[in-house]
Amino acid sequence: MNHSRSHALFVQAQTRIPGGVNSPVRAFRSVGGEPFFVARADGPYLFDVDGHRYIDYVGSWGPMIVGHNHPAVREAVQVAISNGLSYGAPCAAEVTMAETIARLVPSCEMVRMVNSGTEATLSAIRLARGATGRNYIVKFEGCYHGHGDSFLVKGGSGMLTLGIPSSPGVPAELSKLTITLTYNDFDAATALFEEMGHHIAAVIVEPVIGNANCIPPQPGYLQHLRTLCTQYAVLLIFDEVMTGFRVALGGAQALYGVTPDLTTFGKIIGGGMPVGAYGGRRDLMQHIAPTGPIYQAGTLSGNPVAMAAGLAMLELIQAPDFYTHLSNAAAALCTGLQQAASQAGIAMTTQQIGGMFGLFFTDQQVETYAQATACNTDRFNRFFHAMLQRGVFFAPSAYEAGFISSAHSPNIIETTLEAARTAFQTIANEAAILSKSETPIKMR
């Protein structure tokens, strides 16, 4: 593929933008090479500035659940724009959005709009600390909750890719207030609560880890956290920035039947536009200004254009059997990829929850962060580039989940699998040649 225009843009970008990108994973540092620059997107496809088309399994990192540039979402945005871009004052759409979230996710009795998932999680832990009068926050290895200082402690996603346990610029004293546990370890959670449960303000968790690829909870694990939090009056926060409206209409909390005290959402509620929200029990949310003393604000919060896009998308995903079709498509993709890898003699495991999936280059199921980091990342990188050359775009990191949209038809899935069969066989052949070249010559 010729990527001359993308290359020129990347060179130019690096003179004005740190690393040439506005979010680290986009730079392809993990997989090698240079990123392509997108010109437009439609349905299941991305089109780059050099004229190449890609089947997209990143979906803007999750929110494009009905595909890119859906006519209903686009029309809603066009209508909203005709009335103005930003008001700095209340509008009807933000009320409708709050009502819609509360109806679809009953644990969110009240909702506050913000501008990103990071802003939502930062606001949620401030609320938790203010409401409980405690300072300690518990998170889990491999979970990523945005780039807030309290979360950059053994963070996942880009932090995993960069191999940095914390970030310069985060005060050591603040990091001490974040306790990190191993996800899916029942005993570790119990031991921590027995030791200092009465000092913990909140436990924040991705109910399905999406930032160390895709790691689901072990049976009963989320309920175990719920029980411990209730026993010690600790707030349980589900970070559903990735799983919200993605793994089920009511999010992971509906799928697993566990009710958190607070929930955070990200860009999916804006149909892909910059937006976030956090919600929860009424008694907790009333601590937020102006009804309470805990301050949080934002000029663009509840932006009318983002609300319009999000409401249109939320309407579409309530169609009958929407999630059944989404899950079936993801299952077909994962089963096909697993079979293609196996036929080529390549160890790979897939894990899938609803329309969210992960590819692990290992022969074992992955339950923890440590197991995710032990996978063969070099082989993933080879697979990533082999698929990209064949017009299929997976996340440019071995530690990121993939996403299916309703625009991924059976034909799109089969096209992907055809590319994968060729890619896996190519990788297997390369490995065989390398192995043969490294075989020592016997001396007589």
Swiss-Prot record:
Pathway(s) of this molecule: Porphyrin-containing compound metabolism; protoporphyrin-IX biosynthesis; 5-aminolevulinate from L-glutamyl-tRNA(Glu): step 2/2
Entry-linked PROSITE patterns: AA_TRANSFER_CLASS_3
Main location: cytoplasm
Cofactor: pyridoxal 5'-phosphate
CDD domains named in the record: OAT_like
SUPFAM superfamilies noted in UniProt: PLP-dependent transferases
The protein's Enzyme Commission number: 5.4.3.8
Gene Ontology MF term list: glutamate-1-semialdehyde 2,1-aminomutase activity; pyridoxal phosphate binding; transaminase activity
InterPro entries associated with the record: 4pyrrol_synth_GluAld_NH2Trfase, Aminotrans_3, Aminotrans_3_PPA_site, PyrdxlP-dep_Trfase, PyrdxlP-dep_Trfase_major, PyrdxlP-dep_Trfase_small
Modified residues (N6-(pyridoxal phosphate)lysine): 267
UniProtKB keywords: Cytoplasm, Isomerase, Porphyrin biosynthesis, Pyridoxal phosphate
One example of a Gene Ontology biological process annotation: protoporphyrinogen IX biosynthetic process
Enzyme kind, highest EC tier: isomerase
Compartments where found: Cytoplasm
Catalysis: reaction(s): (S)-4-amino-5-oxopentanoate = 5-aminolevulinate
One Gene Ontology term, aspect cellular component: cytoplasm
NCBIfam families linked: hemL (TIGR00713), PRK00062.1 (NF000818)
Assembly notes: Homodimer.
PANTHER family: GLUTAMATE-1-SEMIALDEHYDE 2,1-AMINOMUTASE, GLUTAMATE-1-SEMIALDEHYDE 2,1-AMINOMUTASE 1, CHLOROPLASTIC-RELATED
Family per record: Belongs to the class-III pyridoxal-phosphate-dependent aminotransferase family. HemL subfamily.
Name of protein: Glutamate-1-semialdehyde 2,1-aminomutase
